[in-house]
Amino acid sequence: MKVALLMSGGIDSSYSAYLLQEAGHEVVGIYLKLHDNDLKHAQNIQNIEKVSQKLGIETHIFDAKELFKKHVYDYFVDSYQKGLTPNPCAFCNPFMKFGFALERALELGCEKIATGHYARVKEGRIQEAKDQSKDQSYFLFGLKESVISRLIFPLGDRLKSEIKPEALEILPWLGTLESYKESQEICFVESDYIDILRRHFPVEQKGIVQDSSGRVVGEHKGYMQYTIGKRKGFTVKGAHDPHYVLSIDPKENRLIVGSKEELAKNVVYADPFALPEGFEHFEGEVKIRYRSLKVKAEVRLDESGRLVAHLKEKVYGVANGQALVLYAEDLVIGGGWILDSSLKS
């Protein structure tokens, strides 16, 4: 089978190319230029060319910067301006890696597309990876069934800790790729997301900090530098116990802070993004952010079309803009973008 592989220049995607060949597939490499860091692109492409030459793989480089800016970068920047906490990786996947890249793969005559994601496919759905510590199923919740049917994840049944030693034993020359930095959570952010926002907004505008009763208790450095649940970077006069960001008011450049218990929520509201056809009601588990544990929940659509998840236990740090992802055991059912949350008795 002819399979397109999204290549990054690192060991994971390079070893994936070898595994696909070992499984009998004809591999075609694809590299996407998404951001404006040309130095990083040059290093990645140099690595990819080396891998392609060694394995005899045809590779194609596509410049998708304009599309990426429209669908992902602008969304990222706009979200922070609105006081939200965006999830650019989950937002990128349906549009870029499994949208634009899949279209290019089909044009090249490929039947399927593979990536180095730590995830699996089962029964037409995204399944969690064997390596729970590296599982990336959360970021893939937005993929349509028609896309999932074309996916291959060569690393999904492997442990991350075993891949590098195994790869270097079989393909010792992969050691020359060691200068490749392990991919960050956000590909276009070098060190701190604030550096990106600083190009567009005056992010250091100080503002007031209030407690949940409206009393002014301190000062912060600029609302875009905070997310729900953050407990550092602002002052609270006379405080002896930790204070956490409860909400962000972008119009007034104001933070509302309180105790950890005030941060607790058990109802989450989300804008549906990817749901099974005919979805009305679901009982299973949900995740409110990438590194959170799954929580049992009952989820339904309300009269206005919002997803409403009633959680069986309290969660902390629910941030508007993040993804609410639904799981039936280890299978991703769908999800949406968090709009709000509350605590109900």
From Swiss-Prot:
Quote the InterPro entries the UniProt record gives.
MnmA-like, MnmA-like_C, MnmA-like_central, MnmA-like_central_sf, Rossmann-like_a/b/a_fold
Q: Does the keyword Hydrolase apply?
A: no
Which cysteine pairs are joined by S-S bonds?
Answer: C92-C187
> Which GO terms of type biological process are on file?
tRNA wobble position uridine thiolation
UniProt site (Interaction with tRNA): H117, Q322
UniProt keyword terms in alphabetical order: ATP-binding, Cytoplasm, Disulfide bond, Nucleotide-binding, RNA-binding, Transferase, tRNA processing, tRNA-binding
A GO molecular function annotation here is: tRNA binding
Give the residue ranges for region: Interaction with tRNA.
134-136, 289-290
Chief subcellular site?
A: cytoplasm
**What reaction gets catalysed by this protein?**
S-sulfanyl-L-cysteinyl-[protein] + uridine(34) in tRNA + AH2 + ATP = 2-thiouridine(34) in tRNA + L-cysteinyl-[protein] + A + AMP + diphosphate + H(+)
Q: Cellular location of this protein?
A: Cytoplasm
Per the UniProt record, one Pfam family is tRNA_Me_trans_M
Q: Which residues bind ATP?
A: L6, M7, S8, G9, G10, I11, D12, S13, L32, G116
Q: Which EC numbers does the record give?
A: 2.8.1.13
What does the record give as the active site?
Answer: C92 (nucleophile), C187 (cysteine persulfide intermediate)
Q: Supply one GO CC term from the record.
A: cytoplasm
Note whether Metal-binding occurs among the keywords: no
Question: What NCBIfam families does this protein map onto?
Answer: PRK00143.1, trmU
What does this protein's UniProt record list under function? Catalyzes the 2-thiolation of uridine at the wobble position (U34) of tRNA, leading to the formation of s(2)U34.
Q: What HAMAP family does the record point to?
A: tRNA_thiouridyl_MnmA
Q: Which family does it belong to?
A: Belongs to the MnmA/TRMU family.
Q: What is this protein called?
A: tRNA-specific 2-thiouridylase MnmA
The coding gene here is mnmA
